[in-house]
């Protein structure tokens, strides 16, 4: 029946049990800033979101290569206070390739991070990363007038800080990612 079909295609929602159990990653090509010519090289937004807490990490990098993905991973590992066990992405070439020579895959292996991938041509299975990119586009990029690429990077840092410490998230009982992490690591404080 029609109802059975809809229920089968409905998303299976889940939340991981602890911080770092799985981080969802994705990449998006950013639009040009007002005043830039169409020949200007595009920049790319890299995001990582912790499944348990919804803590967001983001960076703007010059290209969508395995080396930029590796650089972003190293930035996340430097900033992240908990161990990341799995990194879940689509099958983009920035994340997947020959494991013996691919910079991002080598960095994951060195950090003992298991890579997990979406089924081919099903980006919706990486919904948390897809959704956070949509949020970034709608609440940060479309609402801010950037006067330079450096200004855009600065505003991204501010937005990520707001997202992690002020914005409540329905998927984690209207807590902020910071509150979710504090509840996990310091339950006696609440």
State where each predicted segment sits.
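Short small-residue beta-strand/loop micro-motif enriched in glycine and branched aliphatics
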Residues: 55-59, 116-118, 142
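Mobile-element integrase/transposase regions
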Residues: 1-49, 55, 71
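Residues immediately flanking
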Residues: 27, 51, 63, 91
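Active-site beta-loop-alpha junctions of metal-dependent nucleic acid enzymes
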Residues: 41-42, 58-82
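RNase H-like two-metal-ion nuclease catalytic core shared by retroviral integrases
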Residues: 89-91, 95-108, 115-138, 153-158, ...
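Residue-level detector of anion-binding/catalytic polar loops
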Residues: 83, 114
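C-terminal domain-tail junction helix/linker
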Residues: 5-12, 21, 111-113, 135-190
